[in-house]
Amino acid sequence: MEALAPTAQRLLAAAQRLLTSGGFEALKLSAIARAAGESKASIGYHFGNKAGLVTALVDSFAHDANRGLIEDTGELPKGEERIHALIDGETRIAADAESYQSFFEVLPHALRDGDLRERVAALYDGYRETVLRCLDASDPAAKEQLRPFAMLMIAVVDGLAIQHVLDPDVADVAAATDLWERLVRPYLTEAGSLDQG
């Protein structure tokens, strides 16, 4: 996330290292600041509070991949190529076991902590918007029609990621998303996303 100040980037990198090595319980503000070589007050300055830092951390797991999805699909005409690029990109996200392992460390806490839950829910809204942008759903009617697909796309990615993290030798993410692409074509055709217009 290049838009962050260098101090904020160091804090996020330190938080990621601590999360990877010690789980969510290792995300103590003093430990993060110490690992980043920064003051504890810098966390408040850059992120507001721990929930803000954890939200930025969760966003960092998929930020570059989502940006890449928007760029890759935006270069393609509306239609099959664009749909394939979207699902191919989502396949790569689902197969990123390291990022999802970190996300799964945070998720139970987001479900219990109201502030964190609200922030992670806002991230999910952004992920759905990413799918809608990739489908070129720019007007309100198209967004309304394609929002259920966006919700299911995110659910498929999360569900496949869980299976891939638990059993990477058996969970064939690519085969599952190939099937998903075939299953959604009739719906996307009806919605106008596969028209070459």
What are these model-predicted stretches?
Residues 74-78, 112-115, 125-150, 156, ...:
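Hydrophobic alpha-helical bundle segments that form small-molecule/ligand-binding pockets
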Residues 47, 92, 105-112:
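Short helix-capping/turn signature of helix-turn-helix
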Residues 56, 70-100, 149-153:
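Hydrophobic alpha-helical connector segments
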